[in-house]
Amino acid sequence: MFNVSALRAATPSIASVSSVASPSEQHGLSTSVGVGVNDTTSRTGDGGAASSASSASAAPQQQSQSALHNKLEAKWDTLLPTDTNLQCSTWPDSIPLLAGYSATPTFSFDPCTYGSYDPSAYFASNGIAGSMYTLPDQFPRSENDMLDNSNTSNGNKSDKDGIKLEDEDEILEDEENDEEDDGTGKRKKRKRRVLFTKAQTYELERRFRSQKYLSAPEREALAMQIRLTPTQVKIWFQNHRYKTKKSHTDKPINAALLTTMPNAFSSQSTAASFPTRAMPIPMLVRDSSARSSDISSTSPYTVAFGSANSGYLPTPSAYLPATSGYFSNGPSAASSYMTNTQWWPS
């Protein structure tokens, strides 16, 4: 006899499988199930007489049902998610798939695996990388602009190098100037000269006028006052003493040169250089009894150019006219060689 309880237990699994199967398969399944149920009801209605015949006809049907059930289970197994066929991923991980890149990286992210990254080893010195590593430029540039930029950068670099070289040359020149030859062929370094300010020089000169030699405590006090070292103050005083001593020794030499020069006011040099000539000099005569010898002896002309008895001076009567006719109370003709003389009354 056909087992109805086994059929009822099998129908829920078939119904669950039918929800996943396709519509055509569901239709075949329903027809087969309906046929089986109808056969079962018909066989139960016939009684025990038809039990043997129904069991013989149910064997092929069970085989077809089991084959259909195995087929549905195999298809259901293919739809179930497994670790090998399906991987659950989030939305950000699937974004690279839109651009044609694989979601899984092909290399390790461990920094210890690779060496240090040096951009200069892969790209040019002007900073322009490949298109696959950089974003497109918003302002496209031509090759000429790139060449100009590279030339300007090279020019700036060369200018900086030139400035550095010039500075180094100046430093070397200063060092060479600081070195001087002492005569033995060896270079001796000379210290650079220290320039004092006006205030420092004024204070040093003022102290030197009052005191030419300073003791060690006085040097230290003066150095602290004008912000110098005691050694600088000592050297300044030594140099200044030498300069003043040298200037004093030069002054007597100049005086000796002046004394050895010929005197321009001597009588002999004047007589030899200038011709003698008598010049009338106006003067006041108070006493009319003065003689010509006295006048000639006290004349400024004779004082300047020698004595009256000198052979260079001629006699007054040789070139002076007589003035006796012009002055009634004047002196004698011998003493009247002064034409512009005014006489006082006696």
UniProtKB/Swiss-Prot annotation:
SUPFAM superfamilies: Homeodomain-like. Disruption phenotype: RNAi-mediated knockdown in a bet-1 mutant background prevents the formation of extra distal tip cells (DTC) during gonad development. Residues 25-44, 147-156 have a biased composition (Polar residues). GO terms for cellular component: nucleus. The keyword Nucleus applies. PROSITE patterns: HOMEOBOX_1, HOMEOBOX_2. Keywords: Developmental protein, DNA-binding, Homeobox, Nucleus. Residues 9-24, 49-67 have a biased composition (Low complexity). InterPro entries: HD (IPR001356), HD_metazoa (IPR020479), Homeobox_CS (IPR017970), Homeobox_NK-like (IPR050394), Homeodomain-like_sf (IPR009057). GO terms for molecular function: DNA-binding transcription factor activity, RNA polymerase II-specific; RNA polymerase II cis-regulatory region sequence-specific DNA binding; sequence-specific DNA binding. It is found in: Nucleus. The keyword Acyltransferase does not apply. Residues 189-248 bind DNA. Pfam families: Homeodomain. One of its GO terms (biological process) is regulation of transcription by RNA polymerase II. Residues 1-68, 135-190 are annotated as: Disordered. Residues 166-182 have a biased composition (Acidic residues). The homeobox domain is required for the induction of distal tip cell fate. PANTHER family: HOMEOBOX PROTEIN NKX, HOMEOBOX PROTEIN VND. Belongs to the NK-2 homeobox family. Involved in combinatorial activation of gene expression in pharyngeal muscle. Specifically binds a site necessary for activity of the B subelement of myo-2 enhancer. This is Homeobox protein ceh-22. The lineage of its organism: Eukaryota, Metazoa, Ecdysozoa, Nematoda, Chromadorea. The gene is ceh-22.
